Amino acid sequence: MTKVAINGFGRIGRLVFRGLLDRTDLDIVAINNPSGPETAAYLLKYDTVHGRLNKKVEIDKDDLIVDGKRIHVFQDRNPENLDWSAYGTEIVIESTGKLKDKESAEKHIRGTVKKVIITAPGKDEDATIVVGVNENIYDPAKDDIISNASCTTNCLAPVCKVLNDTFGIKRGLMTTVHSYTNDQAILEKAHKKDPRRGRAAAENMVPTSTGAAKAIGIVIPELKGKLNGLAIRVPTPDVSLVDLTVELDKPATKESVNAALKAAAEGKMKGILAYTDEPLVSSDFKTTDVSSTVDSLLTMVMDDNLVKVIAWYDNEWGYSMRIIDLVAFVAGKF
């Protein structure tokens, strides 16, 4: 088993932890949570969105014990002070949301640590990988700092790949209707980057930026510069959707677009992309493992080559499952 540690025990860090508990190929040995083991245990055990963890959670000094498994809890904001090697850690999952550039993330690499997976879009990272789309680019010899991209890119990329491979994409625009996150405010306050994100998240639809569309050009190079988009944050705690409109190179119909997406969901992208023909709503996709679920009832085609596709995603749980998949993929190359 490959030994794994998590730096940062927020929304994504805790869900990745939950997922790792059931793996037989990956062994979670340590976390870093400056708030301490008591807070870590409490927030791990109780989750408003995804429910109570159905495992026994205990604390023993600086360790969590989950169903008898002991996991050490560091409490230090400086990555250079984290002795991951004391627990044989080989891969660090960097989920603080703060150490997103290569220079910061690679501070984890020393001793037994070989690779770092950033749970966000990176900066100057060695590779950005969306599992199911471009993991073939991974070079174990030189790619040590790897970004898992964003949850929205993980939803968008599989759909774009299928459409581009089948019909060709000339250009497109996307909107993510996205559940609010901890980057927003419950009540109004100043926001360091975007004044709209400082408005009350549970009371407003909040237009803001997303880098997901432009990031597609990193994951699928032939689409570089062909997509752009924005986000509308909405008053729900989890589950989002991508509304993608593209102009295609080849003529298409609603039936042919849906057929291509369904074939991918049942074939080469199974477990990454899913397909539904039921009239579902956001809560139906809570705690779904896939990156993206195409809502075939909402597919539209105009004038043979203007296409709209709607895809749902659990921006927390689905994304966390892809992080685990990426860790397992990287570990498999050791």
Predicted regions and their residues:
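Short, solvent-exposed beta-strand edge segments and adjacent coil->beta transition regions
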Residues: K142-D143, A200-A202, V239-D243, L306-K308
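Hydrophobic alpha-helical scaffolding
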Residues: A149-S150, M205-P207, Y313
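N-terminal Rossmann-like NAD(P) cofactor-binding subdomain of oxidoreductases
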Residues: M1-G198, V301, I323-D325, K333-F334
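Short clusters of hydrophobic/aromatic residues that line enzyme substrate/ligand-binding pockets
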Residues: L64, I129-V131, I145, L187, ...
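General structural feature for long, well-ordered alpha-helical segments within catalytic domains
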Residues: G8, V16, D27, S104, ...
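Generic secondary-structure signature for well-ordered alpha-helical cores
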Residues: L21-D25, K161-I169, S179-N182, T210, ...
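Catalytic core of tubulin tyrosine ligase-like
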Residues: G168-A231, P237
